[in-house]
Regions:
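Conserved acidic donor-binding segment of nucleotide-sugar-dependent glycosyltransferases
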Residues: 261, 292-298, 307-313
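A charged, aromatic-enriched C-terminal amphipathic alpha-helix characteristic of glycosyltransferases
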Residues: 309-343
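Nucleotide-sugar donor-binding catalytic core of glycosyltransferases
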Residues: 1-68, 76, 84-93, 106-283, ...
Length: 350
């Protein structure tokens, strides 16, 4: 089976996405990376209606992207087109594309109505990264309700670029860790109360890193009375930072309904003990209480953090059990090769 994997990334991200997608190829499944980022700024098709406007106007950049994709599919004799990240392919274009089409969702309900659900009819298969959706429906139930033809759970994973493959398990366990608690992620207003509560409880022992504008930083400091300025991290600095951390907090934008981010794998993949939201859905990724710990609110999170900081042996055991699970089941090469089992039966009957 040959898959053209369409994604949009730039710089350091593009390099490792392209490299690691291609490297997952073996005798049974081959991957052809296709980066659709350079043709158009993603802001021009971030929402489905914006893409429809571009398609109606026959935007030259869009047409060049489509022509190049068609040529790659034909030259490679691809069986599958898999589309990830921001989806740039209009349903009327896909309708005439003679290949099995799979849509990969990676943001869940936070962006589903903008760039997922509008395209379901144009794809033969939907691969969703999390089983959660809302208090009313799970993601498979929602996809079924929306008329998706086929759908399967296909989680995100740990890229090799985001951990040090040279380190053995004993070496990861022995890393000197001088940061007690870390959070890495965007400083969304919905996350601020939780982060502020942890910061007030642990002070300098808790470090926050990630994406935050000047306005959000100012609001965060003024609203919660914190001397905390959140700064971004260069991609190449993620691993050294993770290797210094004892415990990592994972907080998703809609709590358990958006569980399944890349951070869910990056933290344990670097030997960081992870405490995450996710509720009843977390066991689709890890064994709760053994490979990961969970929390429901700020008070419970602070209690769990204090528990592990005062019990270093338990923290170390949680961290290394999580590390073993990631190395066994959640690396990107393993995840990509799972597509053969997920897609082959459907492609054969296409």
């Amino acid at each position: 089976m040959k898959i053209v994997y369409s994604f949009n990334k730039r710089g350091f991200e593009e390099d490792y996405w392209r490299r690691e997608i291609a490297a997952a190829s073996d005798n049974h499944i081959q991957f052809v990376p296709f980066n659709h980022d350079s043709y158009l700024d993603t802001s021009k098709y971030l929402r489905a209606q914006l893409l429809d406007n571009l398609y109606y106007k026959q935007h030259p950049g869009l047409l060049k992207m489509y022509g190049d994709l068609e040529r790659v599919i034909a030259a490679e004799r691809a069986d599958v087109l898999l589309v990830d990240n921001f989806h740039p392919y209009h349903p009327e274009f896909l309708r005439n594309l003679d290949v099995y089409k799979a849509l990969r969702t990676s943001d869940g309900p936070a962006a589903a109505y903008d760039r997922d659900f509008a395209y379901l009819h144009a794809y033969d298969h939907v691969l969703y990264h999390s089983p959660a959706y809302s208090r009313d429906l799970t993601m498979p139930e929602k996809l079924q309700y929306c008329g998706a033809k086929r759908h399967d759970f296909w989680p995100l994973a740990l890229f090799d670029a985001f951990f040090d493959r040279r380190l053995s398990e004993p070496q990861v366990a022995a890393l000197p860790r001088d940061i007690d608690i870390i959070f890495v992620g965007a400083l969304y207003p919905d996350k601020m109360p939780l982060l502020a509560a942890v910061k007030k409880a642990f002070g300098r022992r808790f470090q926050i890193h990630g994406l935050a504008s000047f306005k959000r930083n100012a609001y965060f400091n003024l609203k919660y009375g914190l001397p905390q300025w959140v700064r971004p991290i260069r991609f190449e600095n993620y691993v050294p930072l993770y290797q210094r951390a004892k415990i990592g907090i994972n907080s998703h934008l809609r709590g358990k309904y958006t569980v399944g981010s890349y951070r869910l794998y990056d933290l344990p993949g670097n030997g960081v003990a992870q405490i995450s939201d996710g509720g009843e859905y977390i066991d689709r990724f890890y064994i709760p209480g053994r490979e990961i710990d969970i929390y429901e609110d700020a008070e419970q999170l602070i209690g769990r953090l204090d528990h592990y900081l005062t019990r270093p042996d338990e923290r170390q055991e949680l961290a290394m059990q999580g590390w073993r699970r990631v190395m066994k089941d959640h690396r990107i090469g393993t995840r990509l090769r799972q597509l053969r089992e997920l897609l082959a039966p459907a492609v054969a009957g296409h």
